[in-house]
């Protein structure tokens, strides 16, 4: 279907000239923002949603600790705790991430300054940013609240995520990574199911990407638990690029498709338990080296073997064959897509442009999938009355 010429983005200046969290909301800023948004290939619905978010954001003004009321805890990890909060002056519901750091004021100020880049990150595939500030020993990052939570939470309820749904997830992740790279020259650095957020409108967005080098350095010691999604080249301490994010996406897709973290691979017996039938393929083979393998504590599978020690797991990622999807359960296109993401040599691994034209992505893009309906029935959410773009089954 040919794309309609997008109508210009309409952004109205805040009536009282209030600041967008400390930055001027002068009309020149709005014009620059309007121009950037028009460069993005958005459909009508995406354009309207982004427009609505940015118009709401103008009403927020400077963020202060006293202006928030805690509603509930959404999750913890990556060195911080995330709360669902109400921003009393605007009445908006937000997600507020609190990161406790024992750091000097100069470092703290640099982190807040670097986080301001997030104001420029406006894409349907990136979680919206309201602002960042420091208060009582904690850095607060205030974001759009995604009512479906993260895909690791969805996976716990679903058991496994269907291939058609993962097709839509793959498109959103590739488009989000492409946007970060092309428009902001940054890579994500931490792609995993808990950093892919979803909502009842059927939107899929990336969060927690490495925009602040100083924050990455300050939190270096808290990243041990997430190393299981890191690429072999990154674990070996060699140069890494956005190709590393592609490995992490591939690993995440295998985990969500199979229903458990895929290293070490499930054996034939476990695959039979997971899928309720005999499953062929490499994933069912015994790990190549004699060892006492097991799964990391974070997986959701039926593997009764003792969990792998973290050093053993990292050694496995670097030295053993990469995970694969079991054949006979998933389409050949999906299997090939994952294989191209999980090539150990980053120079041979598919890049974002190649993945965007892969047969699996082309097929997934053409498929009508009610992502919002599937999500809401899986996790018990009420679906909003406005149908999602892909929900016209």
Curated annotation (Swiss-Prot):
The modification Phosphoserine is found at residues 218, 222, 298. Ras proteins such as HRAS mediate the activation of RAF proteins such as RAF1 or BRAF which in turn activate extracellular signal-regulated kinases (ERK) through MAPK (mitogen-activated protein kinases) and ERK kinases MAP2K1/MEK1 and MAP2K2/MEK2. Activation occurs through phosphorylation of Ser-218 and Ser-222. MAP2K1/MEK1 binds KSR1 or KSR2 releasing the inhibitory intramolecular interaction between KSR1 or KSR2 protein kinase and N-terminal domains. This allows KSR1 or KSR2 dimerization with BRAF leading to BRAF activation and phosphorylation of MAP2K1. Pfam families: Pkinase. One of its GO terms (cellular component) is late endosome. Residues 1-27 are annotated as: Disordered. It comes from Mus musculus. PANTHER family: DUAL SPECIFICITY MITOGEN-ACTIVATED PROTEIN KINASE KINASE DSOR1-LIKE PROTEIN, MITOGEN-ACTIVATED PROTEIN KINASE KINASE 1. GO terms for biological process: Bergmann glial cell differentiation; cell motility; cellular senescence; central nervous system neuron differentiation; cerebellar cortex formation; endodermal cell differentiation; epithelial cell proliferation involved in lung morphogenesis; ERBB2-ERBB3 signaling pathway. The record marks 8-9 as: Cleavage. Dual specificity protein kinase which acts as an essential component of the MAP kinase signal transduction pathway. Binding of extracellular ligands such as growth factors, cytokines and hormones to their cell-surface receptors activates RAS and this initiates RAF1 activation. RAF1 then further activates the dual-specificity protein kinases MAP2K1/MEK1 and MAP2K2/MEK2. It catalyses: L-seryl-[protein] + ATP = O-phospho-L-seryl-[protein] + ADP + H(+); L-threonyl-[protein] + ATP = O-phospho-L-threonyl-[protein] + ADP + H(+); L-tyrosyl-[protein] + ATP = O-phospho-L-tyrosyl-[protein] + ADP + H(+). CDD domains: PKc_MEK1 (cd06650). The modification Phosphothreonine is found at residues 286, 292. This is Dual specificity mitogen-activated protein kinase kinase 1. Found in a complex with at least BRAF, HRAS, MAP2K1, MAPK3/ERK1 and RGS14. Forms a heterodimer with MAP2K2/MEK2. Forms heterodimers with KSR2 which further dimerize to form tetramers. Interacts with KSR1 or KSR2 and BRAF; the interaction with KSR1 or KSR2 mediates KSR1-BRAF or KSR2-BRAF dimerization. Interacts with ARBB2, LAMTOR3, MAPK1/ERK2 and RAF1. Interacts with MAPK1/ERK2. Interacts with MORG1. Interacts with PPARG. Interacts with SGK1. Interacts with BIRC6/bruce. Interacts with KAT7; the interaction promotes KAT7 phosphorylation. It is an enzyme of class 2 (transferase). The gene is Map2k1. It is found in: Cytoplasm, Cytoskeleton, Microtubule organizing center, Centrosome; Cytoplasm, Cytoskeleton, Microtubule organizing center, Spindle pole body; Cytoplasm; Nucleus. Its EC number is 2.7.12.2. The proline-rich region localized between residues 270 and 307 is important for binding to RAF1 and activation of MAP2K1/MEK1. The active site is at residue 190.
């Amino acid at each position: 279907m040919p794309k309609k010429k997008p109508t210009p983005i309409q952004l109205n200046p805040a009536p009282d000239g209030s600041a967008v969290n400390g930055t001027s909301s002068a009309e020149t800023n709005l014009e620059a923002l309007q121009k950037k948004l028009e460069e993005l290939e958005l459909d009508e619905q995406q354009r309207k949603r982004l427009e609505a978010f940015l118009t709401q954001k103008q009403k927020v003004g400077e963020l202060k600790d006293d202006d928030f009321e805690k509603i509930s805890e959404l999750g913890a990890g990556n060195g911080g705790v995330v709360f669902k909060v109400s921003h009393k002056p605007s009445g908006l519901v937000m997600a507020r991430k609190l990161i406790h750091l024992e750091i000097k004021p100069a470092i703290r100020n640099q982190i807040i300054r670097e986080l301001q880049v997030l104001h420029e990150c406006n894409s349907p595939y990136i979680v919206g940013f309201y602002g960042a500030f420091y208060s009582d020993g904690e850095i607060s990052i205030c974001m759009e609240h995604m009512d479906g939570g993260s895909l690791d939470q969805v996976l716990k309820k679903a058991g496994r995520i269907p291939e058609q749904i993962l097709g839509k997830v793959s498109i959103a992740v590739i488009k989000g990574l492409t946007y970060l790279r092309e428009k902001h020259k940054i890579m994500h650095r931490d792609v995993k199911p808990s950093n892919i957020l979803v909502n009842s409108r059927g939107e899929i967005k990336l969060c927690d990407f490495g925009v602040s080098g100083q924050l990455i350095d300050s939190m270096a010691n808290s990243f041990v638990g997430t190393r299981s999604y890191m690429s072999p080249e990154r674990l070996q301490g060699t140069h890494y690029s956005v190709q590393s994010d592609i490995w992490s996406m591939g690993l995440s897709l295998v985990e969500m498709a199979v229903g458990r973290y895929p290293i070490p691979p499930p054996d034939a017996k476990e695959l039979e338990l997971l899928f309720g039938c005999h499953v062929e393929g490499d994933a069912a083979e015994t790990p190549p080296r004699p060892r006492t393998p097991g799964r990391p504590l974070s997986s959701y599978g039926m593997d009764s073997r003792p969990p792998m020690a973290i050093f053993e797991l990292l050694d496995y990622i670097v030295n053993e064959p990469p995970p694969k999807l079991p054949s006979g359960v998933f389409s050949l296109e999906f299997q090939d897509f994952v294989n191209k993401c999980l090539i150990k040599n980053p120079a041979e691994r598919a890049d974002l442009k190649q993945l965007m034209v892969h047969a699996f992505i082309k097929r997934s893009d053409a498929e009508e999938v009610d992502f919002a309906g599937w999500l809401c029935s899986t996790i018990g959410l009420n679906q909003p009355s406005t149908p999602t773009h892909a929900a016209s089954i």
